[in-house]
């Protein structure tokens, strides 16, 4: 989502709060809970998931090899699921890109994990911007990047991970950004 007025342009960045991340975290939580409950059922000798397993004796799982491995996978998956849910809750990677012609600054803000560097803010001057650049890579892992080249040879990448934009959409965004910053466009 873009917000633009006369001298300010703000591009909002989604971060971890994506539908795909919510789906993966939910599936992982449910799946690993099933693994853990199955392993604990084999250890306790009781059906903790009675609607899933029939009460026949030949369907019981021995704890020694299978139940232990199921518990291990369940615990490991719960840790991974907790990590994903925390990243979603804290909106890691979310933030904004602000281009302010009135003050002459570019601000990149992202949320990180809690701690000393929770707020990540990078500021630079618009007068230090040399050009807006489009970089394309084709092949198995193809990607299109919009970046800003600074005079000191640094490169700031602005497109989001997970954005599946066509080359035309990437070019349109880059042209709009170059026009707003009043700098040349490279790599078209």
From Swiss-Prot:
It comes from the Eukaryota. The chain crosses the membrane at residues 22-42, 68-88. The keyword Disulfide bond does not apply. One of its GO terms (cellular component) is chloroplast thylakoid membrane. It is a multi-pass membrane protein. Its main location: plastid. The keyword Ubl conjugation does not apply. InterPro entries: PSI_Ycf4_assembly. One of its GO terms (biological process) is photosynthesis. Keywords: Chloroplast, Membrane, Photosynthesis, Plastid, Thylakoid, Transmembrane, Transmembrane helix. It is found in: Plastid, Chloroplast thylakoid membrane. Pfam families: Ycf4 (PF02392). Seems to be required for the assembly of the photosystem I complex. Belongs to the Ycf4 family. This is Photosystem I assembly protein Ycf4. It comes from Zygnema circumcarinatum.
